[in-house]
């Protein structure tokens, strides 16, 4: 992973464009949700979950407050306020040799934040 891949992630996040998101994901991408026990395997499921998250955080004060990156991985700490609940979390992203996201793990705190995200994500996923 290099600066262009991380910059591409930030651009897709800002745009919320589903086609651009899919283009960033490896065919065998895996998404690890803070509220779903099993990892979600494959580009389509990963895109679906990330797309729902984009919609949950749209219109909030979501922002990354810290970034730690290496050649193939990044840890991106974020904060957002959803319905008055301050949420703090970390996106752990791994890029494969082709520069596509192959693993995306989300960790969130506090418990009230996880519960609120779960509630909002369920609504978004049902509408997709």
Regions found by a protein language model. Name each.
Residues 8, 33-36, 80:
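A general structural-boundary detector
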Residues 2-27:
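Short acidic-aromatic low-complexity motifs
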Residues 1-2, 88:
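Intrinsically disordered, low-complexity regions enriched in Ser/Pro/Gly/Gln/His and often acidic
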Residues 1, 13, 38-42:
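Alpha-helix N-cap/loop-to-helix boundary motif
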Residues 8, 20, 45, 113-116, ...:
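Exposed alpha-helical structural elements
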Residues 18-20, 24-71:
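A solvent-exposed, acidic/Ser-Thr-rich amphipathic alpha-helical stretch
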